[in-house]
Amino acid sequence: MQIEHSIREKLQRAFTPQVLEVVNESHLHASHASSPGTGESHFRVVVIADAFRGKSRLDRHRMVNAVLEEELAGRVHALAIKAMTPEESLPAA
């Protein structure tokens, strides 16, 4: 769980999110040829933070990718990102 912990710590530090979910989905891809077999290659993150206010979806993804540059250059093969402001995370009325 080293990479998962690192992802969680870095995102928490960078964005001080109201909600942070880090889900290791590597087990869903274990049989894929591109899977390194480490058990920490595919992740999904949900980050709800004020830091995304006024930013486009592309800019938000770039922000997350920049924070996790080291992990993405290494053993992380795939990262699904959902980055929202607190207001965007509220259910539609």
Residue ranges and their predicted role:
Residues 1-36:
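N-terminal first-folded block
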Residues 16-18, 39-43, 75-79:
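A generic structural signal for short beta-strands and their flanking turns/coil linkers
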Residues 23, 46-48, 80-84:
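Solvent-exposed beta-strand sheet faces enriched in polar/charged residues
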Residues 29-32, 42, 61, 77:
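Histidine-centered active-site/metal-ligand motif
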Residues 32-49:
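A short, structured beta-strand/loop element
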Residues 52-57:
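Short, conserved charged micro-motifs
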Residues 58-93:
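C-terminal structural segments of small proteins and small subunits
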